[in-house]
Amino acid sequence: MARLAALTTLLALLCSVTCCQAEGYGYGDPGSGGGYPSPSPTPSGAGLAVGFYRDACPNAEAIVRGVVEKAVEQNPGVGAGLIRLLFHDCFVQGCDASVLLDPTAANAQPEKLSPPNFPSLRGFEVIDAAKAALEAACPGTVSCADIVAFAGRDASAVLSDGRADFAMPAGRRDGRVSSASDALQFLPPPSFNLSELTASFAAKGLDTNDLVVLSGAHTVGRSHCSSFVGDGRLNASTSDMNPALAASLRGQCPANPTAANDPTVLQDVVTPNKLDSQYYKNVLNRNVLFTSDAALLKSGQTAAAVVLNAFVPGLWEQKFAKAMVKMASIEVKTGANGEIRRNCRVVN
């Protein structure tokens, strides 16, 4: 702990003098101005474009944002769910809204019923509401995959008070394949160690920096006790979790969670409804739920990134915006490779 404290102090001091300026990470607000592209049709690396619907459905992004803002203001937990929904969609079959498909006679086990998604994944009703509004305004124009991407961006903006607001390229098409087994194969569980996490992200074209930055989304939302109790995180003799947090969690979680008895707990007890860099301070203080969270201190590279994100104002929000756009470009379907669903829950 003494060595970690020294590392924290040293890196914070170094960054305040040199590296933040050298990397162009100022202390200003990276919000809606923020240096990100203006909403005009600007190509992105995945064949997508910022402002994709400017001509075909000029109010598309405003419609989605209005629905998301209303939902998140009523229940901040839905915002956390929408951010997670984008991650869980993109890591399976790419960012193609495959996670939204309901079970059918032909496909009884789609992604949304896979253990990593059911019953914890949420926000589906917000996507439905946005799709209904868009179909009324611009029938058959805006894909469900783009709605998921816009909703993840807009939830980030609301929960961060505008500090993580950014342009989101669009032009995705919706996929027709959804498999529960694929979700199990590609979604990294909270029990993963650092090498497993790194490999999982690399398989989707994301690097270690993306891993550290996107893990920061655990600063909002709740988790089922079953996501960490079985990994020994509450074992006082073996876990590196802060004993005070572990004791609190033991009072909230059953020793052996079941489907009928699996409460949820806050992922960040300090600022639970705010998308901010508090997560990284929690990691340093060992006030995190998952093995995958604690794993960020297991290498010098990731530990240094945790320290910088924790102590440099505005740095994480800028990184998060870029990482979200990168993640939302995973294996996208464009043109004839997909469709634009009329109903996000079923293929056309």
Question: PLM features: residue spans?
Answer:
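Catalytic cores of secreted/periplasmic or lumenal enzymes
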Residues: 2-348
